[in-house]
Amino acid sequence: MFSFFGGNKAPELTQEEKTKLILQQAYDFEVALRAMDYVLDDNPERGLNLLKESDDSANEDERTINVLARGVIEFLEATLSFEAEEMKKASATLAKAETLSQKSKANAEKLNLSNSSKYPPGTVFAVTYTESLLLHALLMIFSESMMEVAKALLKLRKAYYTLQEVLEQIKAANEASITNAENNGEESKSSSASFISEGDIFNSIDIPYKLTEEEAKDKELLEFADKVHKMRAKRLSGAHIDNPPAINRLRNDLGLQAMNSLPKEEIKEHLPLSDDVDRSQATIDEFIHSGVNLCFGILQVVLSLLPPAIGAVLSAVGFRGSREEGLRLVWKATKHRNVHGCIGLLGLMFYYDGPFQFTDDDFDVPASVKEYLNSTEDKKGQEENNDDTSTMTKDMESLKLKDDDLHMDSNTILHPGKILEDALLKSRALFPNSALWLLNEARMLSGKGRLEDAVALMDSIDVNSIQMRQVKTLMIFDRAITLIHLHEYDRAADDILSLLDISDWSHAFYSYFAGCCYLENWRMIQMGDLKSDKEEFYKEKATTLIFKSVDYLGKKTWRSKNLPLDRFVARKVDQFKAMQVKLNLTNPLDAIATGPVYEIAYFYNGFNRMSQKHLDISKKMLTEYKNPAVEANDPDQNLIRDLLVSLCLRRSDKIKEGCDLLDQKVLPTFFKELPDGKVEYVKKNEDPWLYPSALYERALFCWKLNGVQGLSECKEWLLRAQNYADDYELSSRVGMKIKAAIDRVDSALNN
């Protein structure tokens, strides 16, 4: 609406011009926040059109938030699909947002344009810069390439130090605000809690100073300020994206059955779903606060999960992360009713209930052994621990962002339970058209072992109606994963094969996955556990899909190197072919010993989610099925089988039996404890993921057998898992799970 920039030289602006520009920036941020919310409600076309309309009349500063918004949208699409082209596209947009943010920050400082009542000119663009850097770095980390992780560190470093500068500015501003309040009885730059008019004086929370008499009479200005105020009010209540009041859809429990408990009488008024929503914050201040919490929180968590070799280098230069503090800050970000809150919640869902589940259900260690044992807390030790806290963490503790009510203790951070569930249900109510939030609810159900309910929820939506292709892909993939935990292999295979037409992620893995499903059905028929006349069909499909899966690896034109799971598929097929030759077999399926579908189930945390019925089926298929490859007694195939059987036993409460199997059959083949207390690793590479995973699982057995008294030994096993190898097949996902477990044990032992 208002625009003043032109040419290369920054003009001298009058207060009236500055006021209009400040309101224009608040308006642009509201448009961008609304656009991103449309995307989160599965209406990407509407959201992107909003940004395009805003772009058509925008100057460079106004484009900054629009470009970042597009980058955020593309980041979500890329991290949902992990397709190389999507990641490349998002990276390019975020790189552009980085450049524009730097220019906009410099311009705001040159003009002394303060769009915040608290913070120096340009602060909001420092936040957009940090956000662009961080999201760009995350794309590199999610590539599961150690080389890309190393490159990402440069961006994380820039984000870290830029954020540190922002935190120092926020800290100084808050201290000055407190001093002014003490000296004057009120803050010198007060902001009203809503859009009001008092006589001839007009107040707006988006304008950080009193208007001049001329401005107070400027009808166009006042109407525009009112428009911005109403946009924010609608967003905070969820009325801005054309949905009926969210309060009518707010449930107390997960699953389709909980829909029956919704209120019968419809409420017509749009109301915020939480008392945590702060209506007194200006749009720019809200963006700064939520952005700082989100960025620093994610940064801390990411740093805490990096491989130890990289983490040691970073720590040496004061560049370290705290998982617990990071999670706490991300939780604070979720209290904001904007895209930062949504990204924060998606991150938390991925951490707690995602496919890798960094908080393993079997490793439910307490936050503090001392508290667990009801002993007196050592205050001196706590003070010493605080001394090790980074400068940035101390700065964060000094901030007063009206989120003091969200004090989450360590146990709640580890096991948020109902708090996380309620946060998700609010998002489901706010975004009723979104398959993304429905998928996250299904994941939470799956994480609780409610696999049938998870599938029923995913079945409740027509996947062809999902507008975001990446969400559609992920919905189908997650459903297939859940179905193999239920041994429903026909449906799982159908789902996975459908992805060949809509996703470019890994056609080799899709084909291999489907083939493994058909193979298991064929075996179950042979075992007499499945009545079907499709035995020959399953045999032919399994043979074709498994052994032809590697053909897809030679057809890639969009990616220079294979994904970790591609390399996994290539290695497995090579092993099967070698066994077929070794045993001189006619049927290639007879060259496959341990059921490969159970490896896939392990990668996606299946054994922690199966019911006793399905654990029993898995154990039976792993131990009782016979073919020439099984009878050949190949030691490497036996390792996979015995590891997976030990997990079935542990989840069946046969913990000692499972641990004995691991100790006697698995660990001795690649690990030895020497008399002097040292250990010796036998370096094996037949199944690279297995060896550190087995050491990790041994730590969990130790916890299950010995409880808190065995945590020190647990840590020893975890460190052994971490030290077995640096870079190996699937090392990113296995390594991060190990690192997260080490942090949890350290926290329990030291607090």
From Swiss-Prot:
Alphabetized UniProt keyword annotations: Cytoplasm, Nucleus, Phosphoprotein
Keyword Phosphoprotein: yes
Source organism superkingdom: Eukaryota
Compartments reported by the entry: Cytoplasm; Nucleus
UniProt keyword Ligase, yes or no: no
Main location (coarse class): cytoplasm
Protein name, entry field: IML2-like protein CAGL0G03245g
